[in-house]
């Protein structure tokens, strides 16, 4: 049976394609960087390229059998499917950051800017704090620099952008990496094919390494 896979476009796509190729999947057409969004060159694996926030939408509607997406999206959106494998790529971390004069222990209600309102709210609830969340889609780093927010919750890999904007990390919330997620019905109908893919990827994925 053919497996249809939703692959996150961009950085995730670039990092995961070598793993898929090493697992024996024909990815040449995707690696050719055309404007195509659907790839059916391998009779056993069909791919669609989508934006990260849309992967779970395709998965939840049963349009695809498998989604490859960052755990940041899984944590922010929530999902009803099976998170089957950490591919150990795209590794970064959620952080709380702000300007050097920020006091995490300040008693006044904090304004927190983020692309991840659910994750930010959960973090501060665990800290016993009631905060106001400001959702931003662009450069979150601007929020504390312009005074619009007290701090930000964002993901970072190396911290370079934070340092270049004179922002300091005050807390690390959780690790982030790329995961393989399987539709519930697909796991019943295509169990053998899915587990064969997972076993192949387990052999070629990078060993887990700390940031």
UniProtKB/Swiss-Prot annotation:
It is found in: Cytoplasm. It catalyses: 1-(5-phospho-beta-D-ribosyl)-ATP + diphosphate = 5-phospho-alpha-D-ribose 1-diphosphate + ATP. GO terms for cellular component: cytoplasm. Signal peptide: none annotated. Heteromultimer composed of HisG and HisZ subunits. Lacks the C-terminal regulatory region which is replaced by HisZ. PANTHER family: ATP PHOSPHORIBOSYLTRANSFERASE (PTHR21403:SF8), ATP PHOSPHORIBOSYLTRANSFERASE ATP-PRTASE (PTHR21403). Belongs to the ATP phosphoribosyltransferase family. Short subfamily. Catalyzes the condensation of ATP and 5-phosphoribose 1-diphosphate to form N'-(5'-phosphoribosyl)-ATP (PR-ATP). Has a crucial role in the pathway because the rate of histidine biosynthesis seems to be controlled primarily by regulation of HisG enzymatic activity. This is ATP phosphoribosyltransferase.
